[in-house]
Amino acid sequence: EISECLVGSEMCIRDRGYRTTPSVVAFTKSKERIVGDAAKRQAAVNSDRTIFSIKRHMGTDYRKKIDGKYYTPQEISAFILMKLKEDAEDFLGQPVTDAVVTVPAYFTDAQRQATKDAGKIAGLNILRIINEPTSAALAYGLDNGMAQKVLVYDLGGGTFDVSVIDIGDNVIEVLATSGDNHLGGDDFDERIVNYLVEQFKLSDGINLSKDVSAMQRLREEAEKAKKELSSSVTTNINLPFIAMSKDGPHHIDITLSRQTFDELTADLVDRTITPVENALHDAGLSKTDINMVLLVGGSTRIPAVADKVRQLMGKEPSRNLNPDECVALGAAVQGGKLGNQLQAGSAASEIILMDVTPMSLSIETMGGIASRLIERNTTIPTRHSQIFTTAGNFQTSVDIKVFQGERKFTRDNKLLGNFRLNGIKRAMAGVPQIEVTFDIDVNGIVNVSAKDLGTGREQSITITSSSNMTEEEIAKARWEAEIYSKQDEAYQSFIDIREDAVKTLNEANNALAANKKVWEKDKKKNVKAQIGHLGKLISKAPIDKLNEEKAASMHEASEAVKETLR
């Protein structure tokens, strides 16, 4: 979703002189739909019919019920895009049909697909989806052609992204990206709201948290206070008639200092540290390798945020670009290039963007293993194929399950989608050759196909917005991948032992059948006994209940069978 509307590389000045559009949609009681500043202004008196921060719900099954109709995130986002489209058409005096849309770098495949769907609903042909930090780097690179490595720190209203980008020789290459899709300026506002609620409860004995209208007024004042504290050390919050009681009307009149605000939000600022460190690590760089730190997003105006970046990176961040507008500026330049509207030979027309996929993609193989085909921070577009085979004898179909995440086992990752490949030629386990291909386009949208190389049969799936990873799940996946890595490795060894035991059991059964008339009676009896013992151990050790003791028993029995068969 976009918050600014641009034409060429010039900001589109809307009616009333505004340069940005709040992502707010409201429905009046007379069933009119309003978007942007007007929707935001009426929120206090119409809070239950006003929708904020829809970006956080993209790609989920969230629904908003208004007048008996359920609206999807795609539809609500489309209303915002329609408003931007109308503003651009008014500014240009001609129809607008194509657009480049920016999204948080950590948006999942489902969220990107949902964004494309919103564009379609709005009547726009989405030429390209660009990651917001990449778009900001494009805007920065236009006037800074020298080779350099840039860290883009993008803290917006609802999301946080950080990307490490290499700029040079007319190429803008994303080396790594990280982020938190549930951290932004809205969370800073909420801390002020909670503080005001607690202070009012202490002073007046009234809990405002259940009063929808009062809470909306608090949110509006909290946002104003946050902005004022970016340039002042104190601000006054005055809300007359915020509540009524038997004693009469109650008012809020509180002075909030920047120091108190910083204390209320210190943990939010600290949450940006780990994504920065992760991005640097994945890029193979240290903070001393970074030539420039670019602040993007209105929330980077918070002094404590800039101080943290300065402390973390050891250098003064750049303020050359307007943090509210640079993402849209980069998108406009890319749109001009894709639409062949840039002057030939200009710096903008020569620039090439190379972005990455934010999370690893895998399929489930025997034992619940997440077999990765594409690693996180792989440059897109990309295509990768790998040969797999069947796990059972005479198997005529396979289920392909696609996962996103960084853990070794699929149970700890997010299922994106699944499909079945039928018509596999009957054969012993391990004989069929099944080619699985992952294809990620320039928008970061995934297509997965599976082909039986023996029969030529093929099946594919494009991951849609019905399946997705939430913001919390992505952050949790990255965190757990590091915390539980040793635990995962240990369990992986148990899985390997079990799979080896199953393979040995199959080989022993096949050998017994093939040598029924050759082996002596005692050897056949011994092999049958060992097969029975190993089979029981395997059956008592399902994959989800493995432990060190069961793995050791299977390994010992498996080795005994191998020794007998030698």
List the model feature ranges, each with a label.
Residues S3, V7-T60, K64-Y70, F79, ...:
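Oxyanion-binding/catalytic loops of NTP- or PPi-dependent enzymes
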